[in-house]
Amino acid sequence: MTLAVNKKERAGVINPIFTCQPAGAEYATIGVKDCIPLVHGGQGCSMFVRLIFAQHLKENFDIASSSLHEASAVFGGMPRIEEGVKTLVARYPDLRLIPIITTCSTETIGDDVEGTINKVNKFLKKEYPNREVKLIPVHTPSYRGSQVTGYDAGVTSLITNLAKKGEPNGKLNIITGWVNPGDVTEVKHILSEMGVDANILLDTETFNAPTMPDKNSFTFGNTTIEDIAGSANAIGTIALCKYEGGNAAKFLQEQFDVPAIVGPTPIGIKNTDAWLQNIKKLTGKPIPESLVVERGKAIDSLADLAHMYFANKRVAIYGDPDLVIGLAEFCLEVELEPVLLLLGDDNQAASKDPRLAELAKRANHAEYDIDVIWNADLWELESRVKEKGDIDLILGHSKGRYIAIDNKIPMVRVGFPTFDRAGLWKNPVIGYRGAEWLGDAIANAMFADMEYKHDREWILNVW
């Protein structure tokens, strides 16, 4: 059969899959220690993003706003940047980095962010001679792209402005992309097992924050400014997600001769194998027996489920391109049929991704078609469910849950945001243990659906 890639036919958006660029840049920059991003736009551009971060991660984050109002939209909002930076520096004595994140309104009126940064830097040098607070621009016009584009812009801006050539440090850069804290923990685990000294860009493991006796309720990233500066001196860079850090990896290669490997996103057995081989290639470190055992456990667990429960089940997947394509590849490994892939970003490059060509080759040997829609929204999913009724399982974030509920289709929550199930951000989807968790989560969702519908639930008696 075939794989067809098409753009959403409607000009409008009904029930969007994603939010806008600034949200992605905000998620990237809060992964840096001693950093508070300043969102140059209306107050909602930070308030509602903080809300959705809190819903997903159940933590609080410091994200400032220049609180642009009507007068600033007419006369220019540069003074709001100045006031915002001065307030942050005065109130946070440990603050070392302030990314200035633009929005649709400030990009439209053409505020000179770089010029304002130069002006404020002179003020800071005079008023705070013993402090060094770096200001960097992050341009995220939210009338194009999505949170994926914004995350990539955020990481790229951090590295282009802070990376500094020095002595080789022997570290391996890992640009994680927009992943959960549980995924970062899994990345660190695998690197530790291989004995690799790594530079995690960006380390959000600390978003799984404890409640301490001092009642500190705010959460901070764990990547330091020095870590970002040292990325120029690494032995190599691996970007786990092509569209969420791939440009930063290419910049390090072009500007500082740091070898870069972009992808594949290590979801599933095959992609994790490739990731480990890439680590071995760049570092020379062997793959230890402990990871071979983890791989074997994952394969054993998935083999128990694949043919008996997963075979011929048709799956719809939506989310960011790297996650969706990675999940589709995983589905093929376990005999699930990914018949509908919805890429929420309007980046046309995703529609020409080489990984889709590989999926097309596999589709040629299958008995089903794979429909890929880029710049998609959740109405595409709802229409497919109602018109064809051929979806047995949905993989995606919580925004699509009502489609699953209304049409009585089992659903596994993956991606961002997931707020109607507890603790999912703690669980990895990458690596061998992530593959094992995905298999278990899919199976349990299907088992519960069988029980509620009284559909062959007797099979579970011997499970």
Swiss-Prot record:
GO biological process: nitrogen fixation
Cofactor binding remark: Binds 1 [8Fe-7S] cluster per heterodimer.
Cofactors: [8Fe-7S] cluster
Reaction(s) this enzyme catalyzes, per UniProt: N2 + 8 reduced [2Fe-2S]-[ferredoxin] + 16 ATP + 16 H2O = H2 + 8 oxidized [2Fe-2S]-[ferredoxin] + 2 NH4(+) + 16 ADP + 16 phosphate + 6 H(+)
GO molecular function, one term: metal ion binding
The EC number(s) this enzyme carries: 1.18.6.1
Keyword terms: ATP-binding, Iron, Iron-sulfur, Metal-binding, Nitrogen fixation, Nucleotide-binding, Oxidoreductase
Top enzyme class: oxidoreductase
Pfam family, one: Oxidored_nitro
Any one GO cellular component localisation term in the record: vanadium-iron nitrogenase complex
Subunit structure of this chain's protein: Hexamer of two alpha, two beta, and two delta chains.
NCBIfam families: vnfK_nitrog
Family under the similarity heading: Belongs to the NifD/NifK/NifE/NifN family.
Protein name (database record): Nitrogenase vanadium-iron protein beta chain
Protein source organism: Trichormus variabilis (strain ATCC 29413 / PCC 7937)
Lineage: Bacteria, Bacillati, Cyanobacteriota, Cyanophyceae, Nostocales
Name of the coding gene: vnfK
